[in-house]
Amino acid sequence: MNRRPVILATLCLCAFAVNLDVTLVNVTLPTLVVDLGATTRELQWIVDAYTLTFAALVLAAGSLGDRFGRRRTLIVGLCVYGIGNAAGALAPDTTSLVATRAVMGIGAAIIFPTTLSIITNVFTERGERARAIGLWGAST
């Protein structure tokens, strides 16, 4: 059985989720003001904690797959991201939410380059690789 379509779909879904979380939190801001009593300053940190940690670590995290194995690195990234996501859903205050968003950013920084690295190693034929990267790029 050819597992490549399943692998590509999984990697595209991972990349989509990572990028969705950059903007998705903006929809929840009015609710955060009501439920957590968040100030404008705290709202800005809630939005930026994810993006800052993601941007700061994505280049360094890109080499983790080469060092420790791509599959293992992706799983670790997904676990970190998932733990941050679950903890964020249960955050009792804005400080906790900022911290969990930062944890999610760390996981995202691991996931994002690892998905592309896996694609380039699974799809070795030039045309096939170009299509796979194109689909991955479209999902982000």
Put a short name on every predicted segment.
Residues 1-140:
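Transmembrane-helix bundle of Major Facilitator Superfamily
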